């Protein structure tokens, strides 16, 4: 834990890192770190609560700039109880001085990944967590956004079992017609939660990839272990087919990539493993919904509104309290091709509203 900075004593240090967030945020305490930044909790002297502050230093890398800009653009436009918001952003007053960006968010005690390492969940908890994931996802999908990296560590939890989806750095506007060349190379989302079509096709992607990830998360809540822990690309596919069985001819016809289709045709026939054999203690309604989410063919996979209306979630289902976005989200430009200098300018502009004396 960093010592509390005395008023006016300059930035606090946390594990050798400068955290320049005073005077409003003090009493910093280390939480963890990701690929390009550290997260601390801090005391907000204005709202009198502890908050989470993520320090991001992305400006050396085009990919990190892209992810940072995506996350900020999306989260500043989203407003939903099951999606983490941005409360404040701290950065230098000029673009030349801006080396880091500090993002202030609600402090959540833990995440689903940490929880599943230590606790076996009751059916009631599984049901409530799944409902909140789908409630947040309904809003995301209504904005025409794909999260693309749903996994237990991106689901934040607090002691009252509130759940918030975080990390929109890989999110995209849904565009089933656009052929994202190089899709697989830039697709760094965790393999275990990846839909089979991501490994088999490169053309376009749809909201059904997020539903697949939610199915993987439900299976993990039922058993405290990942359902498809593939060691590499082909191993991942083999794990999936080992449980779902061989795809039907109709399902194979959806695979545009001939090499991928021929690979699947070359494999020995596998039978589907019954879900109640894998999860003998699970609620039968939970397994019915799991089956509809972990469907090989993305066109037959359940959609988020149908999933919310499934009998497993009937005690929570309330369409009048499951809000959607006001308007579909649009990125003005494809960020993939922009140089990091341009992305830095866009991050600077996007964060201006939090600067003292800002006038829109």
Curated annotation (Swiss-Prot):
DNA-binding among keywords: yes
Short sequence motif named Cytoplasmic retention motif, residue ranges: 318-322
Motif segment (Nuclear translocation motif): 327-333
Locus of motif TXY: 185-187
Chain residues that bind ATP: 31-39, 54
Ranges for domain Protein kinase: 25-313
Primary residence: cytoplasm
E.C. code: 2.7.11.24
Record: active site: 149 (proton acceptor)
Record note on what altering residue 80 to Y does: In NS13; results in increased MAPK signaling; reduced interaction with DUSP6; no effect on interaction with MAP2K1
Disease: Noonan syndrome 13: A form of Noonan syndrome, a disease characterized by short stature, facial dysmorphic features such as hypertelorism, a downward eyeslant and low-set posteriorly rotated ears, and a high incidence of congenital heart defects and hypertrophic cardiomyopathy. Other features can include a short neck with webbing or redundancy of skin, deafness, motor delay, variable intellectual deficits, multiple skeletal defects, cryptorchidism, and bleeding diathesis.
The protein, known as: Mitogen-activated protein kinase 1
Source organism per UniProt: Homo sapiens
Organism lineage string: Eukaryota, Metazoa, Chordata, Craniata, Vertebrata
